């Protein structure tokens, strides 16, 4: 690839003036040494030179710069290659998510469009239905068998299936459904946000107070207090 005819080299600085002879000498002494390694060694040696040793090369660089300005008064440095940071920006372009067609907004004036998108609640109407909060917790989306499995999940987790649950405070019932030891803060389902749990500092439950859930069928004139739980469960099953 041929160089452009109008390309003008930059004037050499003091280090380039000094290293011009030193590079040739080091390349002759080490013919197998790579050029990058030679540049590293020359840079280290240049830093070790004193100011008096650098002075002749600094003066020579000033003379070359003045001569360059006389020969090329309109010279302006133009790098051939882009800086590395610009190359990275061009290479790694972050893709934008596709938000759907906006044809329904083209007929609106600019002020009306801004007013529609200014409110977060109004802008939510233009998003797909799956982006609604807590849509994955809608009970209507689950079948009866799925709900039954969800209710059995705390009992399954309570049988030490998760060895790290104790370190997180979920002991004797991963979601606070069975145990509530006094040394740990257990949780309850949040009444306002489905799917979330909130901490509760209630007292510990005794083992005798934990009874299996019993289904009651109350007829008119009957109360729950006088019914034997096991007999009522048998009657409910019948």
Swiss-Prot record:
<dbReference type="Pfam" id="PF12336">
    <property type="entry name" value="SOXp"/>
</dbReference>
<keyword id="KW-0678">Repressor</keyword>
<dbReference type="GO" id="GO:0000978">
    <property type="term" value="F:RNA polymerase II cis-regulatory region sequence-specific DNA binding"/>
</dbReference>
<dbReference type="GO" id="GO:0007420">
    <property type="term" value="P:brain development"/>
</dbReference>
<dbReference type="InterPro" id="IPR009071">
    <property type="entry name" value="HMG_box_dom"/>
</dbReference>
<keyword id="KW-0539">Nucleus</keyword>
<dbReference type="InterPro" id="IPR036910">
    <property type="entry name" value="HMG_box_dom_sf"/>
</dbReference>
<keyword id="KW-0804">Transcription</keyword>
<dbReference type="Pfam" id="PF00505">
    <property type="entry name" value="HMG_box"/>
</dbReference>
<keyword id="KW-0238">DNA-binding</keyword>
<protein>
    <recommendedName>
        <fullName>Transcription factor Sox-14</fullName>
    </recommendedName>
</protein>
<comment type="function">
    <text>Acts as a negative regulator of transcription. May function as a switch in neuronal development.</text>
</comment>
<dbReference type="GO" id="GO:0021854">
    <property type="term" value="P:hypothalamus development"/>
</dbReference>
<dbReference type="GO" id="GO:0000122">
    <property type="term" value="P:negative regulation of transcription by RNA polymerase II"/>
</dbReference>
<dbReference type="GO" id="GO:0005634">
    <property type="term" value="C:nucleus"/>
</dbReference>
<dbReference type="InterPro" id="IPR022097">
    <property type="entry name" value="SOX_fam"/>
</dbReference>
<dbReference type="GO" id="GO:0001228">
    <property type="term" value="F:DNA-binding transcription activator activity, RNA polymerase II-specific"/>
</dbReference>
<keyword id="KW-0805">Transcription regulation</keyword>
<dbReference type="InterPro" id="IPR050140">
    <property type="entry name" value="SRY-related_HMG-box_TF-like"/>
</dbReference>
<dbReference type="GO" id="GO:0030182">
    <property type="term" value="P:neuron differentiation"/>
</dbReference>
<feature type="DNA-binding region" description="HMG box">
    <location>
        <begin position="8"/>
        <end position="76"/>
    </location>
</feature>
<dbReference type="GO" id="GO:0045944">
    <property type="term" value="P:positive regulation of transcription by RNA polymerase II"/>
</dbReference>
<keyword id="KW-0217">Developmental protein</keyword>
